Regions:
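A structural signal for short secondary-structure junctions
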Residues: 233, 261-264
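Enriched but not universal
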Residues: 1-44, 49
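Residues on the solvent-exposed faces and adjacent turns
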Residues: 26, 52, 106, 118, ...
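Periodically patterned hydrophobic/aromatic "hotspot" residues that form packing/interaction faces
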Residues: 2, 12, 22, 76, ...
Length: 296
């Protein structure tokens, strides 16, 4: 249990953002609402003890710094959940070289801007529900070189353009289920570019992009930049983009230029209405590279 003096902490907050739980190794050393003391970081600086280690919570201007872990941290689950105009600028964790599990790390942080570049010492092993709800995060950079699984990485967010970095080492990723799930009923969506053209998914076994659409069907808001390395795996024969609707995918006509020429049977799955937006020349350019186009 985390204590300040003899007081047990039931709630850790960075600004208005609540920390739900803290893990060291495989042990959950603190959980929200157990038992009856609250520590708020609405200003100034402070520290807490975790297994004998002092963890510093420091505010500098509008920025928050969380640092001081000396034990190995291997798992984060639902760590930040709440509403607030906070900037959490530097996380300095001591983590195992084998990587960490990120499971629901940022949830419903409406109007929060979380700047976690650098995310010092953090190697991601799996990333599940990493960001969901109305969270806003910028400058996200993670060491993905040990990551093998991504599931629902970003779900129901208003600003998906800021989540992915083109320099991530994705060479060990075997499974991607719903890289980005985004539905929206807004009348206006800002143009979004997701540039992951340098990703090399050479170990991939399974891929689904996720559902991307909005109720305003006249919004061509997503430019999706992929490279031939994205489709380079010899172990995956089906890339599923069926959830990406035609009214979203602004540059679907460029798909043929993103695909490599192949000699073994592989399928790219497109939504039926997305297929109808392809000209015959664009369709033929895809199949000429050896790809089969399917809608199921």
């Amino acid at each position: 249990m985390i204590k300040v003096g003899t007081k047990d902490i039931t709630d850790i907050r960075l600004g208005n953002t609540a920390v739900k739980a803290v893990y060291l190794g495989s042990d959950k050393v603190w959980e929200k609402n157990k038992p009856v003391y609250q520590l708020y970081m609405n200003g100034g600086s402070g520290s807490v003890k975790i297994n004998g280690n002092t963890v510093n919570l420091t505010q500098k201007g509008s920025d928050y710094y969380l640092s001081g872990f000396t034990d190995t941290v291997t798992s984060f689950k639902d760590m930040f959940d709440g509403n607030g105009a906070d900037r959490i600028s530097v996380f300095d964790f001591n983590t195992s070289s084998s990587g960490v599990v990120l499971d629901g790390m940022f949830a419903n942080c409406a109007v929060s801007i979380v700047n976690i570049n650098p995310f010092k010492g953090l190697k991601v092993l799996t990333a599940n529900h990493f960001v969901y709800g109305n969270s806003e995060i910028e400058n996200l950079d993670l060491d993905m070189s040990e990551c093998t699984s991504i599931n629902d990485f970003v779900t129901d967010n208003d600003t998906p353009r800021i989540w992915f970095r083109n320099n991530w080492d994705m060479g060990k990723v075997r499974t991607i289920n719903r890289l980005l799930n985004y539905t929206n009923s807004q009348a206006v969506i800002s143009p979004t570019t997701i540039d992951i053209s340098n990703w090399n998914l050479s170990s991939l076994r399974q891929f689904t992009m996720g559902d991307l659409y909005c109720t305003n069907l006249n919004q061509d808001w997503l430019t999706l930049k992929l490279g031939t390395g994205f489709f380079s795996s010899d172990y995956c024969n089906r890339w599923d983009f069926s959830g990406v609707r035609a009214h979203v995918w602004k540059n679907i006509g460029d798909l043929a230029t993103m695909l490599p020429t192949i000699t073994t049977a592989k399928t790219i799955v497109l939504n039926a209405d997305t297929q109808t937006t392809l000209t015959s020349e664009q369709y033929n350019a895809i199949t000429a590279k050896g790809w089969t186009i399917s809608n199921s």
